[in-house]
């Protein structure tokens, strides 16, 4: 049925990087550029100068991080070597980048290094940024320690610090306790003149309570917001719509949409995308298609996530022709499918038992890329596993390793779940040996997630979709959405919530 991956498959050839002439001069050049940016004067091109300075600061930070040899060397000695040009703005960028890399301990090292510099002045912005980074990494105690350190340094907390603190608590595992803490800080903010809640505060809390499904508290926060001097914005509504939509709370989502209309807040493309994805997840395809038509008539323009969401949700319902019509519509509107779109197509074909078609898309994707995204490999491996083709998945992984595509924990987790569920001990042992060779040590969560495979099915029952998801595209399908409007009255996004 399937052609096994071979050495002649269209994987991009890896070329060794050419040596950089004068390799040691890169950092010096960036340092000089950053220093020169300090001397730029104001004038008609001041805005352009600011942009250039920001770009040069970002380049200096990248240069500093490169000199840590991928995190093997400590960052502080590198900072010491460039102490003459590194300033607060560079440290801010370092905090952000180190946070993305899960290197929160290095963030603290940079912070301690900052405190020793003559130019350092204790500032709320620094503490706010660090508290935010620690919170995102689940280091709540460290965030609280920084909050107390800030007070000891003579800084008085302001709204931004409390917003970061609320956000940090909401990243903790105990959501009930976290929400109670967040509300406590919120009430405290109201009592301090310099810490009055802003729309950012309300947005954080509204989204958090909507994610928890606490509609009563969401309504209370909206009422509080109506009575305050702060006005809701499109981010306010998008956060709540998205949270309700992902929870499958469609009625609650639609009530927020009605509220949005009553405040005359205009939906943006993210609003449309949230609605399309939410209705698609529930397989309410008639409403999903109505929202798509409304988007085409609006001043907004669809984005790749718009189409990717529709392809994914049609795929889950095994509506292959409708999903393919979305690709046609996409190209008709001048969009070129990106690698994420092709990954969505791979999974869609896997749901529809068209694994050979999925492999064809994957091969085209590999041929068109200079670098194979790991998510693309994972999509094809998942497609094989969904259809019980574990040997083909193992061969594809062999080919990927030969082509220097390095799998990560997510790759091994999806394969381990599939092999374990199929009770294929040989493939499980082979996989664990590969992980050991690569230095990936599975943790408790890895095995717990894999054990869930025994209690749930990777594939949905092959039942016929309901009345809202006919097996063939109708005149109202996404592919015809722009032209098939003459027989029915035009429907806006507001009317969708009312139907």
Curated annotation (Swiss-Prot):
Has the keyword Transit peptide been applied to this entry?
yes
| Main localisation | plastid
- Give the protein family: Belongs to the PPR family. P subfamily.
The UniProt entry's GO CC annotations, sorted and at most eight, read: chloroplast
Name the residue ranges with Polar residues bias: 465-484
Q: Record's PANTHER family? A: EXPRESSED PROTEIN, PENTATRICOPEPTIDE REPEAT-CONTAINING PROTEIN PPR5 HOMOLOG, CHLOROPLASTIC
- Residue spans of biased composition, Low complexity class: 1-12
Q: What happens when the gene is disrupted?
A: Albino or pale green seedlings. Seedling lethality.
Instruction: Supply the name of the protein.
Output: Pentatricopeptide repeat-containing protein PPR5, chloroplastic
Q: Where is the transit peptide?
A: 1-45
Q: Which GO terms describe its biological process?
A: chloroplast RNA processing; Group II intron splicing; mRNA processing; regulation of translation
Give the classification, highest ranks. Eukaryota, Viridiplantae, Streptophyta, Embryophyta, Tracheophyta
Question: InterPro entries annotated for this entry?
Answer: Pentatricopeptide_rpt, PPR5-like, TPR-like_helical_dom_sf
Where in the cell? Plastid, Chloroplast
Ranges where the record places region Disordered: 1-28, 458-499
Q: Spans of the PPR repeats? A: 123-157, 158-193, 198-232, 233-267, 268-302, 303-337, 338-372, 373-407, 408-442
State whether keyword Magnesium applies.
Answer: no
The molecular function terms of the Gene Ontology recorded here are: mRNA binding; single-stranded RNA binding
- What function is annotated for this protein? Involved in the biogenesis of the plastid translation machinery by promoting the splicing of group II introns in chloroplasts. Stabilizes the chloroplast trnG pre-RNA by directly binding to a group II intron, where it protects an endonuclease-sensitive site and stimulates splicing. Binds specific sites within group II intron trnG pre-RNA. Binds with high affinity to the 5'-UTR of the chloroplastic petA mRNA.
Record organism: Zea mays (Maize)
Query: Which UniProt key words apply to this protein?
Result: Chloroplast, mRNA processing, mRNA splicing, Plastid, Repeat, RNA-binding, Transit peptide, Translation regulation
